[in-house]
Every structure is written in structure tokens, then in C-alpha cells.
UniProtKB/Swiss-Prot annotation:
Belongs to the GatB/GatE family. GatB subfamily. PANTHER family: GLUTAMYL-TRNA GLN AMIDOTRANSFERASE SUBUNIT B MITOCHONDRIAL AND PROKARYOTIC PET112-RELATED, GLUTAMYL-TRNA(GLN) AMIDOTRANSFERASE SUBUNIT B, MITOCHONDRIAL. HAMAP family: GatB. Heterotrimer of A, B and C subunits. The lineage of its organism: Bacteria, Bacillati, Cyanobacteriota, Cyanophyceae, Synechococcales. This is Aspartyl/glutamyl-tRNA(Asn/Gln) amidotransferase subunit B. Allows the formation of correctly charged Asn-tRNA(Asn) or Gln-tRNA(Gln) through the transamidation of misacylated Asp-tRNA(Asn) or Glu-tRNA(Gln) in organisms which lack either or both of asparaginyl-tRNA or glutaminyl-tRNA synthetases. The reaction takes place in the presence of glutamine and ATP through an activated phospho-Asp-tRNA(Asn) or phospho-Glu-tRNA(Gln). The gene is gatB. GO terms for molecular function: asparaginyl-tRNA synthase (glutamine-hydrolyzing) activity; ATP binding; glutaminyl-tRNA synthase (glutamine-hydrolyzing) activity. Keywords: ATP-binding, Ligase, Nucleotide-binding, Protein biosynthesis. Its EC number is 6.3.5.-. It is an enzyme of class 6 (ligase). It catalyses: L-glutamyl-tRNA(Gln) + L-glutamine + ATP + H2O = L-glutaminyl-tRNA(Gln) + L-glutamate + ADP + phosphate + H(+); L-aspartyl-tRNA(Asn) + L-glutamine + ATP + H2O = L-asparaginyl-tRNA(Asn) + L-glutamate + ADP + phosphate + 2 H(+).
Length: 494
């Protein structure tokens, strides 16, 4: 009797993200100390930040506004009553030895966002990801380890309290994510929403947006969760995806070899592209939460909530859907144009100024995007105004200039701005579209190249490209390409 081969178990990952978003207020959450990034160490501190005896925290009302607006944008229920709590732990970057956070009564709960996932070789799909909660808290300081980028290997450590007390919104997702790609898309969509709202710049390099990943593995088709592992220190969306993909493989390998998966916190080593064990994972009981005695309860009235709701901008997902319907753009084009609010605003202003929607999109996603990215700018920083881009698009559409001429004058427009029409007229770049004028130019060209003309008529048809190139050279690229090709074809065939 032939033995059947064992069926290989298929596994799936269960992933949730905890995202810390620095709220872009001018002062800290409980004090008047500045939140400016990049200042000299320990210059943006005060007695409240340091927790000196006799000081009392006072909630920055702008933080509450930003947190509620973020919660509304994430389709959360806003709590009419919430409170702050003390989260107790000892670490050098925490000057009070406790962090003021929110525990059992967060400001926002039970939300969701929709992500669009496009993986190479697979059909794109949308997925709704639950948002468990959003709560307010204060950031910790920052440790600098001399001689190493980590504590291990350093000779000594320094602490900078400038970041301590900066307002954070911690956004916790449901464990609805299944792949590294989904997690990266979720984090990017969160960043887009926060930037559209204007509540955060979402700058990962400066720590304005930081993600911790919780991940476990289980056999497909089962409901029970596996042992959860937390991953920290991913400083880009690509790093989030790669860290998760590595950790999925590591945990599957553990299950298949019988090695136990330990509940722990691991760090992502960008250089080696691996996760490394950092410490055992704490539970909430380890923090000994209790209500913050120095702050009163937080109350948000229905009137205040609805006032803030009315101030929300059109969000990225809404814009994407509208661009597809109103402008007839592809899902890809709509996604690119709405990635940054400044680009979306610029695009809409260009179309409103009379430009064809698709042509305006092509210019913004092509040559203009290349210039903006190379110079680390936003589209809104450009001297080229939306109405001037619309004028450029319309000059091409009307046949006044060719696309080639438009590309030639674009660098000047991007660097100095101005009217494309005025530049074209001043430089004599208007397109030659008169059939009689083009015919005369073609006659001159053929008369100047009798040998090539004879070879073409003898069957060497590839020489047509030669004649096209010579005509463009003769006219400086100003001749109407479609009309000139028609006339050239007629003349070449005799």
C-alpha cells in the first residue's frame, strides 16, 4: 500500500498596526514649550515637561481638536466623555517616570478606513481595515547612544527631552491585515489622511509618524490567534513591508521545525534586513495604569463635534472616487494625483482654468513630477501657476505649439513661471500649420537630398525617418507633425 505524502500546512499572518502620529501643534500637549524639530538638545523643555514638583499639566485645546478631527476622518465614534491616565514605567527618556496617556476611555473608537492594494501580477483590490481606537498621549524624549546606533556597543548614552511632551495620537488597527503590502498601504493611507487634515506632516524621517507592528501566524481557516510578536524601528513604508515579510517567514519556519515562538518585542535591522529579539513583551498590567489626578475629564459636546466635522476637507479616498467619475481618470492616475493634497489642489485648479483633465494629469505626473521630485519640492512651491499650465495644455490642443516645443519651454516655466503664450511668441516658437508653407518646406528638403529620395523610391523606405528628422531640424521642431507627415508621404511617393 502506497503511503500518501503529508499535506503541507498553509499559514496566514494576522497583523495589526499601532501608529504614533505627532500632532502638529506649535506647543506641547500639556505645556507651552515649543515643538520645533531640530533644535539644540534640551532647549524646548520647561518645568511641566520635566515633571518638577509643583507643576501641573494643562491640556492644549488644539490637541483635542486635532485628535477629534483625526477620529472623525477615520470613521470613529467620538467619546462625549473621556479621560487621561498615567502609564507607569521607568526609562531614561521619560522624565516623570510615567507617561500621560489614555487607557480605558479613549477619545475615539470603532472606526475604519479602506485601502487599495495593487500587487505586481495580481488583480488590485480594496479592503476595509478596522480602527480599534485613537487616543491622545505625550511623546517621550530621545536617547542618543554614543558610538553606536543602539544601546549595545555604545560607550554612553545621552538624552534629549525636546521631544518629551509633544502631542501624539496613537491609532490602533484591528488585526485585519494579512500581508506586508496591506500593512504598508494602510500606513500610507493613514499618513495621507493626517496630511490632508493638516494635523500632522507625517514625516517618518523626523519621527512624526512611527509604526509598531503586531504579528502572529496561524493555519489558514482557523480562528485562534498565534503567539503575538511586536516589531519596532521601521523608518519607511518599504521597511514595514520587508520587516513583516521576513517575520512571516521566520515564524512559519519556527512552526515547521518545532521551535517555540516567544511573545516578545523585536527590532528591524535595516542593514541586515532581519528582525532581532529586543525584550520580552509587556502586558497592560505591567504599566499599572490609573486615572491622571492632575487633569480633569475631557468632554466633547455634540455641537463641538459636528462643528469640527464640518471643517474636515475632502479626504483622499473621496477624491480618488470623484476623479474617476468626474474626470474619467484611471484608478492609477487618481491615486497618484491625490497622494499629496497640494498636488490634488493644483490639478483641480489647472482643470478649472480650462485644461483637458487627462492632459493636465499627464503633465503633472510626467515632466513636472520628475522636476518636483528631483528638487524635493511640492507642486505648490513652483513658480508655474495652475492657470499657466492650463494655458500650455491649451496651446498644444489648439495646435499653436507641438508637444516637443512645450517640453522645451517647460524648464523655464518651472524655474521662473510666466505665460507660456508670451514665451512662445517672444521666441518665435509658434507651430507651422499652414499646408502651403509645409509643402514648400518639403519641396526644399527633397530637392536638397536627391540621392536619398532616389533610394527611398527604389524601396529603401526606412529613409522616411531620415526625411522626418531633417524636416524637424530645418524647422526647429515647429512643424505640425501630423500634417507634415501627410504631405511628406505624398511627396516621397511622387
Amino acid at each position: 500500500m502506497t503511503a500518501t505524502a503529508p499535506v503541507k500546512t498553509e499559514y496566514e499572518a494576522v497583523i495589526g498596526l499601532e501608529t504614533h502620529v505627532q500632532l502638529g501643534t506649535a506647543t506641547k500637549i500639556f505645556s507651552n514649550a515649543s515643538t520645533e524639530f531640530g533644535a539644540d538638545p534640551n532647549t524646548h523643555i520647561d518645568p511641566v515637561v520635566l515633571g518638577l514638583p509643583g507643576t501641573l499639566p494643562v491640556l492644549n485645546q488644539k490637541v483635542l481638536e486635532y485628535a477629534v478631527k483625526a477620529g472623525l476622518a477615520l470613521n470613529c465614534q467620538i467619546a462625549p466623555y473621556s479621560k487621561f491616565d498615567r502609564k507607569q514605567y521607568f526609562y531614561p527618556d521619560l522624565p516623570k517616570n510615567y507617561q500621560i496617556s489614555q487607557y480605558d476611555l479613549p477619545i475615539a473608537e470603532h472606526g475604519w478606513i479602506e485601502i487599495e492594494v495593487a500587487e505586481k501580477g495580481k488583480e488590485p483590490y480594496t479592503k476595509k481595515i478596522g480602527v480599534t481606537r485613537l487616543h491622545m498621549e505625550e511623546d517621550a524624549g530621545k536617547l542618543v547612544h554614543a558610538g553606536s546606533d543602539r544601546l549595545a556597543g555604545s560607550t554612553h548614552s545621552l538624552v534629549d527631552y525636546n521631544r518629551a511632551g509633544v502631542a501624539l495620537a496613537e491609532i490602533v488597527s484591528e488585526p485585519d491585515l494579512r500581508t506586508g503590502k496591506e500593512a504598508a498601504e494602510y500606513a500610507q493611507e493613514l499618513r495621507r489622511i493626517m496630511r490632508y487634515l493638516g494635523v500632522s506632516d507625517g514625516n517618518m524621517a523626523e519621527g512624526s509618524l512611527r509604526c509598531d507592528v503586531n504579528i502572529s501566524i496561524r493555519p489558514k481557516g482557523t480562528e485562534k490567534f498565534g503567539t503575538k510578536v511586536e516589531i519596532k524601528y521601521m523608518n519607511s513604508f518599504n521597511a514595514i513591508q520587508r520587516a513583516i515579510e521576513f517575520e512571516i517567514e521566520r515564524q512559519i519556519r519556527c512552526l515547521e521545525t518545532g521551535e517555540p515562538i516567544v511573545q516578545e518585542t523585536r527590532l528591524w535591522d535595516e542593514g541586515k534586513q532581519v528582525t532581532k529579539s529586543m525584550r520580552s513583551k509587556e502586558g497592560s498590567s505591567d504599566y499599572r495604569y490609573f486615572p491622571e489626578p492632575d487633569l480633569g475629564p475631557i468632554e466633547v459636546s455634540e455641537t463641538q463635534r459636528e462643528t469640527w466635522r464640518s471643517e474636515l476637507p475632502e479626504l483622499p479616498a473621496q477624491k480618488r472616487h470623484r476623479y474617476a467619475e468626474q474626470y474619467g481618470l484611471s484608478a492609477y492616475d487618481a491615486r497618484v494625483l491625490t497622494d499629496e493634497k497640494s498636488t490634488a489642489d493644483y490639478y483641480e485648479a489647472t482643470v478649472a482654468a480650462g485644461a483637458d483633465a487627462k492632459q493636465a494629469a499627464n503633465w503633472l505626473m510626467g515632466d513636472i513630477a520628475a522636476y518636483v521630485n528631483a528638487n524635493k519640492l511640492l507642486v505648490s512651491d513652483l513658480p508655474l501657476q495652475p492657470q499657466d499650465l492650463a494655458e500650455l495644455v491649451n496651446l498644444i490642443e489648439a495646435g499653436t505649439i507641438s508637444g516637443k516645443i512645450a517640453k522645451e519651454i517647460l524648464p523655464e516655466l518651472l524655474e521662473k513661471g510666466g505665460s507660456p503664450k508670451a514665451i512662445v511668441e517672444a521666441k518665435g516658437l509658434t507651430q507651422i500649420s499652414d499646408p502651403a508653407q509645409i509643402e514648400a518646406l518639403v519641396d526644399e528638403l527633397l530637392a536638397a537630398h536627391p540621392t536619398e529620395l532616389e533610394q527611398f523610391r527604389a524601396g529603401k523606405t526606412k529613409l522616411q525617418g531620415f526625411f522626418v528628422g531633417q524636416l524637424m531640424k530645418k524647422t526647429g521642431g515647429r512643424v505640425d507633425p501630423k500634417l507634415s507627415n501627410q504631405i511628406l508621404n505624398q511627396k516621397l511617393k511622387g
